[in-house]
Amino acid sequence: MAEYSGPAKPTLALNPREDSQFEKDLTQIQRRAKKKKEEKLNSGVVYLGHLPSTLSESHIYDYCAQFGDIRRFRLSRSKRTGNSRGFAFVEFESEDVAKIVAETMDNYLFGERLLSCKFMPREKVHKDLFNQCNVPFHPPSFPAVKRYNQKRGHLQMLKMEYRFKKKEKLLRKKLAKKGIDYSFPSLVLPKPKKEISSIANTHGDSEANQDPTPVCTPTFLERRKSQLMEINDDDEIILKLPVSPVKEDTQKTPAPESSGKKRLRKRKSKQ
């Protein structure tokens, strides 16, 4: 008796020797059937705009799947932040279903917003519109952002400058080969020149203006004295104290002088 080799395969020929040929014929028949379905049903693409930022791919897909079978779906997201841009593209298997969805859903109040739903003809649908639509979304990696914005050393900065200059040369060569006369600023900014030369020039001018060796003549000495006096006069600060009003009154009203005659009269009367 033959040993039991597990459950029977779904595509199994009556003659076990003809299994491989039978599978090939079956796959060809399935492909032809799919092509016939695609020829019968022309797909239609719908543009959805003014979408709330809180909606994700699963929410919009489940909502649109109520109208008919969806072939492809894509929600536009920012590559830098990963947030929704507020518009999406839905491809229905039937073009008639897509037109019905565009008519019914246009200006529909959804999440305090009026949706804009438009049917896109085949001429306006780009061939790369649904590229990587089946790939799940991954937010941008923040370690890569930190690595890009990190503080670099002197050697790392030199390597970056070398790479930028190399790219700039290649770009200029490509433009020259194509005959494009286009001038653009360099990718690496020129380093600012140090102000040593300007400082040296100022010192040289000041030394040149001075006399080489001043002669001690009487006119020169008088000039020096007058300069010193002006400096001392500027440095002096005179403080004036306010005069109290009581002293002024005392000065204005002097005390009366006592007369000696009155004293003598008093003594005589006592005697």
Swiss-Prot record:
An example Gene Ontology molecular-function term: RNA binding
Crosslink site: Glycyl lysine isopeptide (Lys-Gly) (interchain with G-Cter in SUMO2): 37, 178, 191, 247
Record PTM N-acetylalanine, positions in chain: 2
InterPro entries, per database record: NIFK_FHA_Ki67-binding, Nucleotide-bd_a/b_plait_sf, RBD_domain_sf, RRM_dom
Disulfide bonds: none
Broad class of where this protein is predominantly found: nucleus
Subcellular location: Nucleus, Nucleolus; Chromosome
Annotated keywords: Acetylation, Chromosome, Isopeptide bond, Methylation, Nucleus, Phosphoprotein, RNA-binding, Ubl conjugation
Residue(s) carrying Phosphothreonine: 213, 217
Residue numbers bearing the Omega-N-methylated arginine modification: 223-224
Biased composition (Basic residues): 261-271
Single GO cellular component term: condensed nuclear chromosome
Residue intervals of the RRM domain: 44-122
Sequence positions bearing Phosphoserine: 226
Modification(s) after translation: Phosphorylated.
Residues with Omega-N-methylarginine modification: 113
Residue stretches in coiled coil: none
Crosslink site: Glycyl lysine isopeptide (Lys-Gly) (interchain with G-Cter in SUMO1): 247
Region: Disordered, residue numbers: 1-20, 242-271
Assembly and binders: Binds to the FHA domain of MKI67; this interaction is enhanced in mitosis.
Name of the featured protein: MKI67 FHA domain-interacting nucleolar phosphoprotein
Originating gene: Nifk
